[in-house]
């Protein structure tokens, strides 16, 4: 079993931070209703620049993949609230397997 860590950064448009935070709360409720929150650790934080970070720690990559369609549907629903980079991406994200030295 390979624990998987995924970190996603969202940058709301200026003036949309509060509305986006409300939508993140809805995402958390979606995660609870689907059972994802029972299988994974999901945390959110807000940075000083107004960006939001979502951190997910899943017991396996499969757990993360199972939730992918729901997550992308949510992301599409908040597209109008997000800044996009020069390539049109709405997020900055990294995903990988965790490891330790014990």
Please report, for each region that a protein language model flagged, where it lies by residue.
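Short tyrosine-centred short linear motifs in exposed loops/low-complexity segments
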Residues: 1, 14-16, 62
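Absolute protein N-terminus
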Residues: 1-2, 102
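Active-site-flanking beta-strand signature of metal-NTP-handling nucleotidyl enzymes
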Residues: 3-11, 53-55
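Short, surface-exposed ligand-recognition loops at beta-strand->loop->(often short) alpha-helix junctions
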Residues: 11-23
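An amphipathic, aromatic/His-enriched active-site/gating alpha helix that lines ligand/cofactor pockets
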Residues: 26, 30-40, 57-92
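Short, solvent-exposed loop/turn elements at beta->coil junctions and helix N-caps
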Residues: 41-45
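Short, low-order "capping/linker" segments at domain edges
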Residues: 94-102
């Amino acid at each position: 079993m390979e624990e998987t860590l995924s970190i996603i950064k969202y940058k709301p448009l200026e003036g949309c931070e509060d509305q986006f935070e409300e939508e993140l709360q809805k995402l958390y409720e979606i995660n609870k209703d689907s059972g994802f929150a029972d299988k994974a650790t999901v945390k959110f934080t807000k940075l000083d620049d107004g960006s939001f970070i979502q951190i997910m720690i899943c017991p396996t990559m499969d757990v993360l993949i199972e939730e992918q369609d729901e997550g992308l549907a949510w992301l599409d629903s908040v597209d109008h609230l997000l800044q996009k980079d020069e390539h049109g991406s709405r997020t900055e994200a990294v995903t990988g397997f965790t490891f330790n030295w014990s």
